[in-house]
Amino acid sequence: LSKKSIIEDLDHSLLTLGTDYIDVLYTHWQTTDKKLYPIEETMDALMTLKKQGKIRAIGASNVTEEDIREYCQYGQLDVIQEKYSIVTRKVEKELLPVCKELGVSIQAYSPLEQGLLTGKFTMDTTFPNGDVRNNNPSFQPETRKKVLDILEDWKKYLEKYECSYSNLVIALTSQMIDGLHILGGARKP
């Protein structure tokens, strides 16, 4: 998006929300065509909005190490948002080092691995056609079996700490990276 478009879109959103600012503005799914949507122009818009007090923090979601470095060339990238759980941990090797180096926080999305870590699924659980979990490597039989075995072993902790699998998994995940933020997004209680 162009600088003008980013600023106009945020102004419209603020009006719709009835507020003067938002805490974090994330860019999502970074473009592969950096000439069409250069990070420099995006950061110029975001830094302008931050200076105006319309956003408090700048975030980018689903990024590479190169993206993070480029964002930081043009201003302060405050936080990245990435898929991260006790099953999906590529952030630790691929992005954590550069985030530590550049002072960028990490927010984890899908910490319950699309429900797999809630204890609600079995090896016999199937999903409707078109459900993204059908293609998620974590839900494939070999990995699902390993996860279910771990959850079975953790049953003793549910009673000991009087909590659910979700509570336990989120607590564990929050301790895996110093300062990690967890984004919850359950569809059902």
Question: Where are each of the predicted segments found?
Answer:
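Generic alpha-helical secondary-structure signal
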Residues: D9, L25, A171-L172
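Structural motif corresponding to the early beta-alpha repeats
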Residues: L1-K3, H28-W29
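Active-site groove signature of glycoside hydrolases
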Residues: L14-D33
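Short, acidic/polar
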Residues: S2-L17, T64-E70
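Beta/alpha (TIM)-barrel catalytic core signal, keyed to glycine-rich beta->alpha loops juxtaposed to Asp/Glu
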Residues: Q30-P189
